[in-house]
């Protein structure tokens, strides 16, 4: 399973003459409803402020605390209008989880030249600041909530979150040493630990064979495993060979 922190973004709400804050609130609701419809397990921020949107530092601090408490696996940043790029970047940097950027398609301006949002430009701005913060992110193509690309992009992102979560908590069992001819299987144990916190647990072959002999002599555990294999797998060898 993957838990995603969904945090809708809006330009500073005090600048209502630039983009429509009410429409941003409306679209954040539509986006949350679509996530629920798709069965996405996400943490919302409706309790952070009245709009349930990120637009200032005070809100960012509360959101970070909540997402840390919930132990989210990924950060979804839907831009309901332009977005507050530096707050998005600060939050993503602090949480250190995979980040997904997305925004709806921009509508055409009305007869007075007024636009409800400028999501595309906002995504460019947020992406640029994220790169300056050295925060990797995934950009999902601007689309409507019911477009197939929206669901596919979310599913792909959740798969990435699961991979990253597993990778960060990985421990590798190394049985004996690498055979001389197997140069493709060599690894740098120190680099794995220093860069990725991945631990290797080496087991010498004599210790492994001794434990195998003890288990075979005792018999109980081996019998359970053989029975399980017979019940759940297609076995094409004899019992003594299976042992």
Give names to the regions the model predicted.
Residues 42-67, 210-219:
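N-terminal beta-loop-helix "entrance" segment that forms/cooperates
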Residues 52-168, 181:
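Cofactor- and metal-binding active-site motifs of prokaryotic enzymes
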Residues 1-5, 9:
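Single conserved hydrophobic/aromatic residue that forms the stacking wall/gate
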Residues 8-9, 224-243:
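Active-site loops and adjacent core secondary-structure elements that bind or stabilize anionic groups
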Residues 32-52, 136-142, 198-203:
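Short beta-strand elements in bilobed, periplasmic/extracellular small-molecule ligand-binding domains
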Residues 14-29, 113-120, 181-185:
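Glycine- and acidic-residue-enriched helix-capping/strand-helix junction motifs
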Residues 194, 199-218:
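Terminal amphipathic helices with adjacent charged low-complexity linkers/tails
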């Amino acid at each position: 399973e993957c838990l995603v922190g969904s945090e809708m973004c809006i330009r500073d709400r005090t600048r209502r003459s630039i983009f429509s804050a009410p429409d941003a609130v409306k679209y954040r609701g539509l986006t949350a409803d679509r996530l629920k419809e798709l069965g996405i397990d996400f943490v919302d921020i409706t309790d952070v402020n009245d709009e349930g949107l990120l637009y200032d530092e005070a809100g960012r601090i509360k959101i970070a605390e909540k997402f840390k408490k919930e132990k989210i696996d990924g950060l979804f940043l839907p831009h309901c209008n332009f977005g507050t790029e530096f707050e998005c970047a600060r939050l993503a940097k602090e949480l250190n989880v995979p980040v997904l950027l997305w925004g709806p398609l921009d509508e055409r301006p009305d007869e007075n030249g007024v636009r409800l949002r400028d999501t595309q430009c906002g995504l460019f701005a947020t992406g640029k600041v994220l790169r300056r913060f050295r925060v990797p992110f995934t950009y999902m193509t601007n689309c409507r909530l019911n477009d197939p690309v929206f669901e596919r992009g979310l599913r792909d992102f959740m798969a990435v979150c699961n991979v990253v979560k597993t990778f960060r908590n990985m421990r590798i069992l190394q049985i004996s040493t690498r055979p001389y001819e197997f140069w493709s299987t060599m690894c740098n144990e120190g680099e794995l630990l220093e860069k990725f916190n991945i631990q290797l647990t080496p087991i010498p072959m004599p210790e492994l064979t001794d434990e195998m002999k003890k288990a075979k002599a005792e018999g109980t555990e081996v019998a359970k495993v053989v029975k399980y294999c017979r019940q759940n797998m297609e076995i094409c060898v004899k019992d003594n060979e299976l042992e």
